[in-house]
Amino acid sequence: MEEDWGKTVSEKVISAYMSLPKKGKPQGREVTVLSAFLVSSPSQDPKVIALGTGTKCVSGSLLSPRGDIVNDSHAEVVARRALIRFFYSEIQRMQLTSGKSNEAKRQRIDSETSSILESADSSCPGEVKYKLKSGCLLHLYISQLPCGYASTSSPLYALKKIPSTQVDDSLLVQASDICSSRHSDVPEIGSNSNKGNGSQVADMVQRKPGRGETTLSVSCSDKIARWNVLGVQGALLYQVLQPVYISTITVGQSLHSPDNFSLADHLRRSLYERILPLSDELLTSFRLNKPLFFVAPVPPSEFQHSETAQATLTCGYSLCWNYSGLHEVILGTTGRKQGTSAKGALYPSTQSSICKQRLLELFLKETHGHKRESSKSKKSYRELKNKATEYYLMSKIFKGKYPFNNWLRKPLNCEDFLIN
C-alpha cells in the first residue's frame, strides 16, 4: 500500500510536470528540485493542483521593500505560493456560484471540477468563511529531501551512512533526539557566533544554502515544520480560511541513500518530532499536524542531484504552475519573471504572480472587493498580516520555542509596503 501510494503520487506529479512547455526546465546537465501539492477525496484520486521547481534564493542585499520579488524560489516554497493562489481562485469560484445573479459567470467556470473548499461553520472566529471540504486531503510531493535539518547534509543523515558495526546506537539516539533538549543560550543565525554559511546548530533553524553572498531565507525543513503547526495558508488567508494541513508527505528516493536507511522515519524526526515541544502551547485554531510519510521511486535524471553540491549544476529558473491557470517562469536569483531586463526591473510586468504584492492584491480583493480605500485608512502588508491575531500569536510562540527560537528575521521594511 505504501509503495503504491508513493508511486501513484510521483507519477501524477511527474506527468503534470512533463505536460508543461520546455521553457524554464533544466537544460543539458542541469538539475532542479520538483515539488507539488495534490488533493484527493473518497471519490477522487490524487490530482495535482499546484507545482513548483527550483533551488535558488535572492541574496540578502537584493531584498526589496516593495514586496515585488519572490525571495525564496526553492521548489517547495514556489509550490506552496502557487497553492495559495489556487485557494484564492477557489474562493472566487464559490463566490460566483453562490450569487444567483451570476448565471452567465457560473457557466464559464470549469464545471468538471468541484471546489475543494466549503463554507465554514458560523461558530468560527472572526470573519473566517471557508474551510477545506470535508473528506478532502492535501498531499505534498518533493523529488528529494528538503534542505536543512531533513537534508542529506544533516548529522542525523550522516550517521546513517556509517556502517552499523562502527557506530554506537547511542549516537543515533543522541542525533535524532537533539530537539528534545531545551537550550536557552543558542546562537542567532547571522550572529557573531555563527557568521555567514558556516556551521549551524544541527537541529535548529538553518539558513538556505547559497553560493556566494548569504541568503536570508529559512530552510525548507524548517518551513514545512512550521506548516505542521500553522497550516499552509499563511497569515492573510487565515483571516478567511481555516488552517489547512498536509495529510501526507511523499519524497523521492535517492540513488545515494545508505543501506537500511528509513526515509519515512527520517522525515518523521525532521518534520514532526521537532514540533513536539509546542504541544502544550497551542492556541485554539491550531494543532500539531502529523502527516503520513511515504517514499517515492527515484525521480527522472533531471531531479537527481550529486552527493556533493559542488558536483551539481542546478537550473537557475523556477517553474510555477497551478490548476487554476497560473504558469510562470521565475529567475531564482532575482525573484522576477524570466526575461526581465535590468532597465525594466521595477515594472509591474516583471513581477511574479506569487510575490507578496500580488498575493496581497488578491487578499484585498477578497476582503474589500473593489472598494477604494483612502490613503489614511490603508494598512501595510505587515499590519494586515498582524490582523490575524491568533495566527500572529501562534507564530510568535512557535518562533520563541526551541528548536525554532533562532528563526531568521528579514528587515522590517520588507513588509511595510502598501498597495496603491
From Swiss-Prot:
Cellular component terms (Gene Ontology): nucleus
Cellular compartment(s): Nucleus
Residues the record lists as binding 1D-myo-inositol hexakisphosphate: 80-81, 223, 226, 385
Reactions catalysed: adenosine(37) in tRNA(Ala) + H2O + H(+) = inosine(37) in tRNA(Ala) + NH4(+)
Domain A to I editase: 50-417
Cofactor: 1D-myo-inositol hexakisphosphate; Zn(2+)
Top-rank lineage group of the source organism: Eukaryota
Main localization (coarse): nucleus
Gene Ontology molecular function: any one: RNA binding
Binding site for Zn(2+): 74, 147, 220
Keywords: Hydrolase, Metal-binding, Nucleus, tRNA processing, Zinc
Family of this protein: Belongs to the ADAT1 family.
Function field: Involved in RNA editing. Catalyzes the specific deamination of adenosine-37 in the cytosolic tRNA-Ala. Generates inosine at the position 3'-adjacent to the anticodon tRNA-Ala.
Listed name of the protein: tRNA-specific adenosine deaminase TAD1
